[in-house]
Amino acid sequence: MIDPYQKGKVYTMNKKELVKLAAAVTAAFTISAAAGFGVLSSSFGTGEKSYAAETAVTQTVEITRTQAADTTSTSETGTTANELNMTTDGAIDTTDIFTDRDLEQTADLSEAKTYTVSDSQTIEITSEGVYVITGSASNASIIVEAGDEDKVQLVLDGVTITNDSIPCIYVKSADKVFVTTTDSENSLSVTGTFTADGDTNTDAVIFSKDDLVLNGVGTLNIQSSDNGVTCKDDMKITGGTINIACEADALEANDSIRIADGEINISTNKDALHAENDDDDTVGYIYICGGTLKALAGDDAIHATTIIQIDGGKLDLNAHEGLEATWIQINDGTINIAASDDAINAAYKSAKISPTAEFNGGYVTIVMGSGDTDAVDSNGNLIITGGTLDITAQSPFDYDGTCQKTGGTLIINGTETDTISNQMMGGGKGGRTGGRKGW
């Protein structure tokens, strides 16, 4: 009989997947391994299983800032917002969460200005428009300091920038900035200790104080001694291929991270996706409705203060913890998690909502390490109405509130079951046991 908790089974069963990801991320960069970035040593699940979407429940908390649609068309390709696989009655209000322009993958270059980066020089952009960036340089920076209502589109067309201590792209002010790749390879890296801009800790290769959209049809490689991309407002990813290798958080935002499409590959010693606002615990959420994400993270793969809502996409996550937020809602998608602590952890991160782990659809595969680890850990309630949960773990569930199972398929250590056993092995990392219920 095979012991499903044997360490070798958990951590070596998909070794080739890990090797492929690590190679894909590191080989994409023009900076060699001499920069000193660490690589972890676990594995991804394959997760090649079909699934049927289920209807989401209707409990809603409105934490999304409603934005007027961008009316200027700048593209020949891309989907529209009403074509996305979005749950309209989920945890997050998805109304206007993406504009049509967010989803456009190519820029209108008819009135674009072109700049070529050069060593130790700064390109300053102070007004709305489309700007094509080309060339290779060291210690160069693109600084956007435009008006509060200006939308700026930076079109990266075969750009390589290698810096010692300053962001390659620094958005000081604008309404929204689009970083769009052409059908080209673009590499941005910072190898040394970041230098602050006055009181602003500019700690990322791309650092934005305002809304940021990453999209396009090409490849963007980011390598950092700290964070990969930091946004102090809302960050959206709607297309392109993005490869990030960094020491700290790969994608970090204050208000939200929203992913509609694209191919994202991350190797980091901290969090792959991190949304947190120290001043407002009603924001700091992560929404995913498409694309692919492969993340190898030393801490959390996806971490949010308030809500993680997944409506679609394919996620392969290998981390200390897979998903961590106050309310985690999975409505669709294919999600594979290999974790050494809790794979899914609904903990007290926000005082505005109650910890809930909720499964309404999709196919979720979880493989846990041995020891005091939980596949699904909720400091509040556990809700299962649909989808498939395929768990290999000593402790499949640990919840402090109530459990409601009205549908879905549950597979525990290879056996389909309708029984949920509460392990009660203690609160998850960063959470508190017992306590607040409701809003």
Predicted regions span which residues?
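A composition-driven surface/loop motif
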Residues: 2-439
